[in-house]
A protein has these predicted regions:
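Glycine-rich phosphate/adenylate-binding loop
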Residues: 1-130
Length: 130
C-alpha cells in the first residue's frame, strides 16, 4: 500500500500468530511469515469509502499521490517477488519514503519477526504443534 509520498510492500501468509510457532525450527530457514494484517493491523481498519473506490488514475488526477511513489513501490515489489521465486529473499517488509529519500526493510530473522509478532525467538524456533 502507499500514501502520498510513502508506501510499503509486505509479504506473509500466516494469518494467526499461533501459526508462527516453529517457523524457524530449521536454523537459517523460515517456513512462514506473518501476514500483512499481523504486521500492520492498521491495514485492516476500514478506510474512508471515497479513498477505497479511487483508481490509481483517479488518485493521480486528484493529486493524492506523488508522481513517483507507484513506480518505487512497484519496483520494490518486483524485486521481492523475483527474490522469493529464486530462493534468495531476505526481507519480508520494505518501506519507501520519497519525501525524505529513505528506504528500509525488515529482514527474515527470528529477532525481527519475533519483534513484529510480539513473541520471543524461542517461540519461533520451538517445535510446532499440530
Amino acid at each position: 500500500g502507499n500514501h502520498y509520498e510513502s508506501g510499503q510492500v509486505l509479504l506473509g501468509s500466516r494469518s494467526r500468530i499461533a501459526d508462527m510457532k516453529g517457523a524457524f525450527q530449521v536454523p537459517t530457514f523460515c517456513t512462514g511469515l506473518p501476514s500483512p494484517g499481523i504486521q500492520h493491523p492498521d491495514l485492516l481498519v476500514e478506510q474512508d469509502l471515497t479513498k477505497q473506490i479511487m483508481s490509481c488514475e483517479e488518485a493521480a488526477i486528484a493529486n493524492a499521490q506523488s508522481m513517483s511513489i507507484n513506480q518505487r513501490i512497484a519496483n520494490e515489489a518486483l524485486d521481492m517477488l523475483l527474490r522469493l521465486l529464486s530462493g534468495t529473499l531476505t526481507r519480508f517488509a520494505s518501506y519507501v519514503n520519497c519525501k525524505h529519500g529513505t528506504a528500509w526493510s525488515k529482514f527474515i530473522t527470528p529477532e525481527e519477526i519475533g519483534s513484529v509478532i510480539g513473541k520471543p525467538e524461542k517461540f519461533l524456533k520451538s517445535k510446532a504443534t499440530a
